[in-house]
Regions:
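Beta-strand-rich structural segments
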Residues: 78-83, 149, 475-481, 520, ...
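Extended acidic/polar, glycine-enriched regions
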Residues: 82-172, 505-515, 523, 533, ...
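Non-catalytic, glycine-rich low-complexity segments
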Residues: 16-18, 22, 26-91, 163-168, ...
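Short flexible loop/turn segments that cap and initiate beta-strands
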Residues: 91-96, 138-145, 474, 482-484, ...
């Protein structure tokens, strides 16, 4: 597999050995070559499954069950099931699909018999008709299930449940985007896949945490940039109601990359959240005939597998070239280029358009002064890249154009790498609406005020903890609200009242005076919202806030816990930077720490992290089992905080534990038989293939007119063996035996019976010469009936 973002499936049946033989799965990861220009991470960072299947089975992602509207009241799910027969003979079976309502009740069932030849695929088509289903939407993400079973002789041999949703989508050249017949604006974000403390190895629960923060901000769509994401992320978008622009990693039409594209479409085409495919991001060939031809071919690959969704390409140039890829897609995709929106629309009035990436505004959470010498960006939405726009300008450009379907802001969260516009020692980006931990920046409340309609929003920035020499000096104050107007007060005195500008929001210049800065929001002349920032006292106590009250004790569930300090009145101190130390007891472990500071070089693994503008995060993950989990956070001079979270007993997730790979010794040679006891330490030439004969485990040696035989094998010790020795396990060793290693007797078996036998050996720095001197009665069989493995004393990291 030549992509770090796509899955691969390998049938290991031809390579597996059975019984006591050792099967070792080794995966070599080579991350020398970059796929992206951000910090991508490396290794096996998503789930890996060992799957046992019947010979006739449903292939992975082999059920296509995406509903299609037929009439105003009638829908069809053209269920297509792909089977594979790994057996040696033709297999006959029956495929049964059942549509389950959101409450689990069966709605309809279809059956089809089919016969699949050995090592071939078979396809069953079982269309299901549905009348007046409930619709999937961001506000009400209703999911149905298609249960698919394979039966042979009345017995279920394979079963898969596939979630799906009923919804219609349409991109219109004049009116933008329509979902279920309703004209809505896409309010989207882009993001990479890493989080503070864990990098790209993000636990499933953290995906839910991140998406929940976005939903609260008013987001209804997410562009997976610029690669396929984890399957669990897509499932969370389905269940939480977040539409997805599903983008591939590499723009290439060679067979390997077409295979990757096919895998992505096959995996995600059942997701109701997916509203649009994107076949590339900002490719240099976007304004060339070659680029058009490549997109045409990728377009065809996608449409063959999913004819129901439109396709775009995220262009950042080439829009006005004679040949450009907008000519080969269903929806034109703009990355930035705000100034070209109107001209392009005039020249291409029949092409639906969306912004596929915009913004690239820059902020440091908690900072309110830009200082390039310190790699700091202010939080007033004044800074952006040369190619981008501020949050306010970018949204206004989309919101005021009805033919523009929507936007996808760069980015939802900060991410490791790409510290534009700075360089080292900055180690993460400034683009995020939230920081690496998911702590909101000012932009979060700005978009919440612009996008949330079902609740009142009012936030004030900045904090009100300024040094004494700031008294009397003007402080820029912003109110972020969806009210009609906002009144600002300082220490009870009205400063002014302003009508809310839904794009620019409201700004004041307020001479600093310690105390309480308060904002009041009005709609239709009535107070609908209040908020305040206060000058706090010095911190006196640490405070911990868990994201949830419990963890599933499955060894996978995880949660972020917010760390802060409060003053004597329990108020958050927004300027604190105390170093925190964490201790944890119970069935859990700390898997990461962070604070959202793009210039911080503290380790993201361990039990310490400083606050950054009053906040830090510690991420814990459950172990298997149940019981109380207790976390304590402390810092010198302040009262520590302790919380207890319960790990709940849940059914264990089927898994195979990672073990030390035992070294299998399977290249043995046997000496000539003898009636007298031979010298087990005598020199033997490695190339002596005349007097010594190859033997294998499982085959005993009959002592014809003899009583002794020597078995010999050599091996190069692992590093752990070199440092502290190990053990050798003989499975079903038959006959009396002396075990010699490098000329030293390390163990003796004194019985003739067949049994497992283990010997320990000391640290061995060089190549090891292992000999087994076997002794038995003439005419009996002795030897290695099972395998022989060399094991370490500890886990190899």
């Amino acid at each position: 597999n030549w992509c770090g973002y796509t899955s691969m499936y390998i049938d290991i049946t031809p390579y597996a050995t059975y019984g006591d033989d050792v099967n070792t799965i080794a995966v070599r990861v080579d991350a020398d070559a970059q796929e992206g220009w951000w910090y991508e991470g490396a290794g096996i960072y998503r789930h890996t499954w060992l799957v046992k299947r019947s010979p006739l089975h449903i292939i992975t992602d082999g059920v296509f069950a995406h509903p299609v509207k037929k009439t105003e009241s009638q829908w069809e799910i053209p269920v297509e099931v792909s089977l594979y027969n790994s057996g040696k003979l033709t297999a006959d079976g029956e495929v049964e699909v059942t549509l389950l309502a959101p409450d689990g009740q069966p709605i309809a069932t279809k059956n089809q018999k089919l016969s699949v030849k050995a090592l071939r695929e078979g396809i069953a088509n079982l269309p299901i008709t549905v009348t007046k289903p409930l619709f999937w939407s961001p506000e009400n993400p209703v999911l149905y299930k298609v249960k698919t079973q394979v039966k042979q002789n009345g017995t279920v041999t394979d079963e898969v449940e596939t979630k799906c949703g009923f919804r219609t989508i349409r991109f219109d050249n004049n009116t933008g985007f329509w979902l279920n017949g309703e004209n809505i604006k896409i309010k989207g974000v882009c993001s990479h896949q890493d989080h503070a403390g864990v990098g790209v190895a993000v636990p499933d629960a953290l995906w839910e945490f991140r998406l929940r923060k976005l939903k609260e901000m008013g987001v209804n769509a997410y562009r997976v940039a610029h690669n396929p994401v984890a399957k669990e992320f897509m499932a969370a978008c389905d269940s939480m109601g977040i539409m997805v622009l599903d983008e591939n990693r590499l723009f290439n039409t060679s067979p390997e990359y077409v295979r990757q594209l096919e895998w992505q479409v096959r995996r995600d085409r059942n997701c109701p959240s997916v509203i649009l495919w994107s076949v590339f991001n900002e490719e240099p060939m976007q304004g060339t005939e070659n680029g058009v031809e490549m997109v045409r071919r990728m377009y065809d690959v996608v449409k063959k597998m999913d004819p129901t969704r439109p396709i775009t390409a995220a262009m950042n140039g080439g829009f006005f070239s004679e040949y450009n890829v907008s000519q080969a897609v269903d929806v034109g995709g703009f990355n930035y280029q705000i100034e070209s929106y109107d001209c392009f629309h005039e020249e291409n009035p029949d092409l639906p358009l969306t912004s596929t990436e915009d913004g690239s505004a820059l902020m440091t959470r908690g900072e309110y002064v830009t200082d390039y010498s310190k790699n700091l960006m202010d939080s007033y939405d004044t800074q952006c890249t040369g190619w981008g726009a501020t949050h306010r300008r970018a949204w206004k450009a989309v919101a005021e154009r009805p033919w523009m379907a929507g936007c996808f802001y760069w980015t939802a969260f900060d991410y490791h790498g790409e510290p534009t516009p700075h360089r080292w020692p900055t180690v993460s980006s400034f683009f995020g609406i939230m920081d690496l931990c998911g702590f909101p920046k000012m932009a979060y409340y700005l978009h919440q005020a612009q996008w949330v309609k079902d609740k009142d929003v009012l936030e004030l920035v900045p904090h009100w903890n300024w040094p004494a020499d700031s008294i009397g000096k003007p402080i820029k104050v912003m109110a972020l609200s969806n009210a009609d107007k906002v009144k600002l007060l300082l220490n009870g005195k009205v400063i002014s009242e302003q009508a809310v500008d839904p794009y620019e929001m409201n700004t004041w210049s307020v001479p600093y005076k310690p105390g309480k800065l308060e904002a009041i929001g009005y709609k239709n002349g009535k107070i609908v919202s209040r908020t305040k920032v206060e000058t706090t006292k010095d911190p006196v106590q640490v405070h911990l806030t868990p994201d949830r009250n419990s963890l599933a004790g499955d060894g996978r569930d995880a949660m972020p816990i917010t760390v802060e300090v409060v003053d004597s009145k329990g108020r958050h101190v927004p300027t604190a930077n105390n170093m925190m130390e964490f201790t944890l007891t119970g069935p859990a472990e700390i898997i990461g720490v962070g604070n959202g500071n793009p210039n911080c070089h503290e380790p993201e693994k361990g039990n310490k992290r400083s606050l950054f503008y009053g906040l830090a995060q510690v991420i814990i993950q459950s172990k298997e089992g149940s019981g109380p989990i207790t976390l304590t956070a402390s810092t010198p001079g302040l009262k520590p905080a302790t919380i207890t979270i319960n790990a709940e007993q849940v059914p264990p997730i089927p898994s195979i534990a990672a073990e030390n790979p035992p070294m299998l010794l399977n290249r043995w040679v046997a000496s000539p038989l003898s009636t007298e006891k031979p010298d087990a330490t005598r020199q033997i030439a490695d190339n002596d293939m005349n007097s010594w004969q190859p033997v294998s485990g499982g085959n005993l040696i009959k002592l014809e007119n003899a009583n002794f035989v020597i078995l010999r094998a050599t091996f190069n010790p692992y590093q752990a063996h070199q440092e502290e020795g190990g053990s050798i396990l003989f499975k079903q060793l038959t006959g009396k035996a002396e075990i010699w290693l490098n000329g030293q007797l390390i163990g003796s078996k004194t019985t003739d019976k067949e049994e497992d036998f283990t010997v320990e050996f000391p640290a061995a720095k060089e190549r090891c010469d292992l000999r087994v001197l076997l002794n038995g009665t003439t005419g009996e069989a002795v030897g290695l009936k099972g395998n022989v493995t060399v094991r370490t004393k500890r886990m190899i990291p």
